Amino acid sequence: MNIETKYHGTVQLSQLALVSFENGLPGFEHEKQFALLPIHDSPFTILQSIQHKDVAFVMIEPFSYFPTYEIELDDATCEQLKIQKENDVALYVILTVAEPFTNTTANLQAPVVINVHERIGKQVILTNTPYKTKHRLFPETVEAK
């Protein structure tokens, strides 16, 4: 299957690259099918709608940048995503890419959870958590005066 993408041009996909989101993503409920497109030689992955090329999100696995990040999935989410064990799950967070890039932030409050075996996913909005929608990817640097 060939699709037009926002960042990669036209790409050929295998079924293994596709992920179904039963309810879409918040704000994009009509977008149900996405492709995971890793950016080679980088920690970034693009979550690309297969229907609309302009609907694409830059994501990372959070643990490299936020080593203490952890979440607990509720039973309903585990059931919906058919999660049996921890290694069924790939966890990503969506970035807001800024200029300069050092001002880029990660949404730790709403991770994207994917069952890698079933190829189904959901963006989970966490409540009662210290995480916010904008955590700096890179610590602020203090400039010399």
From Swiss-Prot:
InterPro entries: Flagellar_assembly_factor_FliW, Flagellar_assmbl_FliW_dom_sf. GO terms for cellular component: cytoplasm. Keywords: Bacterial flagellum biogenesis, Chaperone, Cytoplasm, Translation regulation. GO terms for biological process: bacterial-type flagellum assembly; regulation of translation. Its main location: cytoplasm. It is found in: Cytoplasm. The keyword Ribonucleoprotein does not apply. Transmembrane segments: none annotated. Interacts with translational regulator CsrA and flagellin(s). NCBIfam families: PRK13285.1-1. HAMAP family: FliW (MF_01185). Belongs to the FliW family. Acts as an anti-CsrA protein, binds CsrA and prevents it from repressing translation of its target genes, one of which is flagellin. Binds to flagellin and participates in the assembly of the flagellum. This is Flagellar assembly factor FliW. It comes from Anoxybacillus flavithermus (strain DSM 21510 / WK1). The lineage of its organism: Bacteria, Bacillati, Bacillota, Bacilli, Bacillales.
